[in-house]
């Protein structure tokens, strides 16, 4: 039996939105490839504001249930405002919109090259993306020009915002955190302080503690980016643990947005951690470290410092992050105006 609903769906007033599905180190990325309205605006931030103001219903329809889930992550591709960029991109999650996304860059570049959307230019194919946090220069490292082995990208300058911030967490007591920026602001703390491990079986407790820490830091510290007001908010909490693999540096979990758990090691979070480790004198010059996610040793990103600069009054590093991603499917989502539940919901 052949099922062909296209003609009837168009006649019913339904719209179709297409997407490529990918993941980087276990964290999903839903890449919207067609069916969205044109977004006016001279800059990427203007286009994102326009989408958030007029089409946030589409974020909910594509990220929330029944098409997505609480941990779903997506992105929208737009023409770049910067002439140096191949493409503009902004990212979607359960709560709204993020400023940058490391796993998203790795997954998106993999998909762009492997689908032929970006022309392959040899074993190392450069891809430049404009994001809300700035211009990101990535490289797809190919294996025999057939598929992408891994992607590396030079992230935005990253810096430590506040050291040794003491906050009180209910049921736990005082916790010492550092706040650093790597494309977004994070509160970073050792998981040992809260009596947990970064393991899948502890995820409910990790989410609760991560949210409590973020709330406590927001109550004590005003986070302000020195150059861009739209980046001035605490995005998440990173809890750091010992690694599963001896030659890896550490394991961490990031709880971000509305209690969302990153399955990957978090590319922007790793950038923030590199800035913090450098400020603490715990990194040798040009040392590369491998950081695992809550999923274990197979879910890992590699990071190193490739430069130094200033961001306003802050000493900053220029981080490079690399990791693997895979295309896992494609979708054609049907948005029917008669389907009210299909507009998006969460059970929590």
Name each model feature, range by range:
Residues 1-178, 190-348:
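A glycine-rich beta-to-alpha transition motif near the start of alpha/beta enzyme domains, typified by
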Residues 183:
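Glycine-rich ThDP/TPP pyrophosphate-binding loop and its adjacent helix/strand module
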């Amino acid at each position: 039996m052949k099922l062909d609903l296209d003609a009837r769906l168009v006649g019913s007033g339904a719209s179709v939105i297409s997407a490529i599905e990918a993941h980087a180190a276990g964290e999903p990325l839903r890449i919207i490839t067609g069916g969205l309205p044109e977004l006016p605006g001279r800059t990427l931030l203007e286009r994102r504001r326009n989408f958030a103001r007029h089409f946030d219903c589409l974020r909910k329809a594509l990220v929330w249930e029944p098409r997505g889930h609480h941990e779903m992550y997506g992105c929208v591709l737009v023409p770049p405002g910067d002439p140096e960029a191949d493409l503009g991109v902004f990212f979607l999650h359960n709560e709204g919109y993020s400023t940058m996304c490391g796993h998203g860059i790795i997954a998106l570049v993999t998909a762009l090259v492997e689908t032929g959307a970006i022309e392959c230019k040899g074993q190392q194919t450069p891809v430049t993306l404009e994001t809300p946090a700035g211009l990101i220069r990535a490289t797809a490292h190919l294996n025999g020009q057939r598929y992408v082995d891994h992607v590396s990208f030079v992230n935005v300058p990253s810096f430590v915002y506040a050291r040794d911030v003491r906050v009180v967490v209910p049921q736990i007591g005082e916790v010492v955190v550092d706040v650093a920026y790597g494309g977004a602001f994070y509160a970073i703390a050792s998981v040992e302080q809260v009596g947990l491990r970064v393991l899948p079986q502890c995820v409910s407790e990790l989410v609760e503690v991560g949210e409590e820490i973020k709330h406590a830091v927001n109550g004590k510290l005003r986070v302000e980016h020195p150059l861009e007001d739209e980046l001035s908010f605490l995005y998440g909490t990173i809890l750091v643990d010992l690694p599963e693999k001896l030659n890896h540096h550490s394991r961490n979990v990031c709880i971000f947005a509305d209690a969302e758990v990153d399955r990957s090691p978090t590319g922007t979070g790793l950038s923030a951690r590199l800035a913090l480790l450098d400020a603490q004198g715990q990194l040798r010059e040009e040392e590369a470290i491998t950081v695992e996610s809550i999923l274990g040793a197979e879910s890992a990103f590699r990071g190193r410092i490739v430069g130094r600069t200033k961001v306003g009054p802050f000493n900053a590093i220029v981080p490079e992050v690399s990791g693997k991603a895979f295309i896992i499917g494609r979708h054609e989502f049907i948005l029917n105006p008669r389907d009210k539940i299909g507009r998006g919901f969460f059970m929590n």
